[in-house]
A protein has these predicted regions:
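Hydrophobic transmembrane alpha-helices and their immediate loop junctions
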Residues: 1-213
Length: 213
């Protein structure tokens, strides 16, 4: 597990804890921060399931996974060999977001059931937040640029159309760098408007994208 996971864990836990601290009706004291830490751990479990889904599809395609490394905004599965066809690339890439959207649906159902049963806000609030974060992670990962899953989907489609893997890879990498620049610009905007937490988030995402594109 890459050391950068500590950064995202602290940011996730603090962000949600701060949100709960300001939420009307939520218990005070240590409750917001403890709940934030627990929710952060569940969030990381969701990221791990996202990556395991890639690994599962890879193994079904006859490709072994040496290890999975969690990074600041997801993870990277280290494969024993390169993908052999656009079809396998597409299936492996789309598996992660699909699982993430399924998790969002599960948390959404739990949120509705718990809320209608008048369960404590200590339990209900994290469910709602996990719906939002999984939808965000799923949607973000579908952006068409490396190293995101959407970039691999784009590469698979270009690879199939042109028959040139190197050309398809280059196009997906450039797209990833362009996306990183726009995300970084959004981060600067948030800093200028004194929304520092969002600014940090977006700048970290931009750096992550650009370095790995």
């Amino acid at each position: 597990m890459n050391a950068s996971w500590l950064i995202i864990f602290v940011l996730v836990s603090y962000s949600f804890g701060a949100l709960l601290y300001e939420t009307r009706g939520f218990p005070g004291g240590a409750w917001p921060w403890v709940t934030g830490v627990i929710t952060g751990a569940i969030f990381f479990a969701c990221l791990l399931l996202h990556e395991l889904s890639h690994s599962y599809v890879a193994k079904r395609s006859g490709i072994s996974i040496n290890r999975i490394t969690l990074f600041i905004f997801g993870g990277v599965a280290e494969m024993s060999e390169d993908v052999q066809s656009p079809r396998d690339e597409f299936r492996m890439a789309i598996a992660g977001p699909l699982v993430t959207f399924i998790l969002a649906g599960i948390f959404g159902l739990l949120y509705l059931l718990l809320r209608s049963s008048n369960v404590s806000i200590v339990v209900v609030a994290p469910m709602g937040w996990l719906v939002f974060t999984n939808l965000m992670i799923g949607g973000f990962n579908l952006l068409p640029g490396f190293p995101l899953d959407g970039g691999r989907v784009l590469r698979s489609l270009l690879w199939k159309k042109t028959g040139d893997l190197r050309r398809a890879t280059r196009a997906a990498s450039i797209s990833g760098q362009v996306i990183a620049v726009f995300v970084g610009g959004a981060g600067v905007y948030f800093f200028l408007t004194r929304n520092y937490v969002s600014g940090v988030w977006f700048l970290l995402i931009a750096i992550f994208l650009y370095q790995l594109a």
